[in-house]
């Protein structure tokens, strides 16, 4: 049983000596990009449309910045002569306390890019770092796993430096960040740590993230701010 009866899932239709792209091709490519992203069904629901930005002025400011970044990213991608070349697009960092909505916004950016056919790989910091460390003695596995995040067209790092930070944690994330820094590959980053704290944890990583993000550093402040509590009201 084929998903597409027209091309029999070949994505192309043969017309004499010519192969014509089937109308299902773009849909299949988009599905593949989404599957490879590592973003769960739950997180796919985190969009700009479902974000409650009316809660607080800080939330609204962060929302506006994230929306504008997404629009600029898509525009730059659409205007690029080579659709695979997105290395001139800067990164974005969203930092703030627990429950400030930074994960929702970073996911909304990622989901917007995915909907436009732009590949994004999701990296939940603590989970992935733990998996990598558990297999650190397997050189082939280590290189392959780290390479996935180094070479992703767009990388979303969620909750950077969450949990107790060890020297090996810093070394692993430096490998990823430094590769992307040297190759101008954009990142979407969320963290509970503010910019100064990121620099204190590791200046080499923090300084690279700041340089890569340029004007796209969003700090969500406010002691009473908790997006998770108020979004349902």
Language-model regions, residue ranges each:
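Walker A/P-loop nucleotide-binding motif
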Residues: 82-106
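Conserved P-loop NTPase "ATPase switch" module shared by AAA+ and STAND
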Residues: 126, 145-168
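A short, basic N-terminal segment
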Residues: 1-61, 65-68, 216-217, 222, ...
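Loop/turn-to-beta-strand initiation segments
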Residues: 118-119, 151-154, 183-189
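P-loop NTPase Walker A phosphate-binding motif
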Residues: 104-118
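Short glycine-rich substrate-engagement loop in P-loop NTPases that contacts/grips substrate
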Residues: 54-64, 95, 114-151
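Pre-Walker A adenine-sensing motif
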Residues: 65-85
């Amino acid at each position: 049983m084929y998903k597409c009866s027209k091309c029999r899932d070949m994505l192309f239709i043969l017309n004499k000596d010519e192969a014509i792209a089937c109308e299902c091709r773009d849909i299949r490519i988009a599905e593949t990009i989404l599957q490879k992203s590592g973003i769960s069904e739950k997180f796919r629901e985190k969009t700009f449309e479902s974000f409650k930005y009316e809660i607080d002025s800080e939330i609204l400011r962060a929302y506006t910045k994230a929306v504008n970044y997404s629009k600029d990213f898509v525009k730059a991608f659409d205007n690029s002569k080579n659709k695979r070349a997105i290395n001139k697009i800067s990164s974005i960092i969203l930092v703030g306390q627990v429950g400030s909505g930074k994960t929702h916004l970073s996911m909304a950016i990622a989901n917007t890019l995915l909907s436009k056919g732009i590949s994004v790989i999701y990296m939940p910091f603590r989970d992935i770092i733990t998996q990598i460390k558990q297999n650190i003695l397997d050189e082939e596995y280590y290189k392959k796993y780290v390479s996935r995040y180094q070479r992703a067209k767009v990388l979303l790092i969620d909750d950077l430096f969450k949990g107790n930070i060890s020297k090996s944690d810093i070394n692993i994330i430096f490998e990823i960040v430094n590769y992307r820094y040297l190759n101008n590959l954009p990142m979407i980053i969320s963290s509970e740590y503010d910019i100064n704290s990121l620099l204190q944890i590791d200046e080499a990583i923090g300084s690279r993230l700041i340089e890569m993000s340029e004007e796209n550093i969003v700090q969500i402040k406010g002691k009473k701010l908790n997006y998770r509590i108020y979004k349902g009201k």
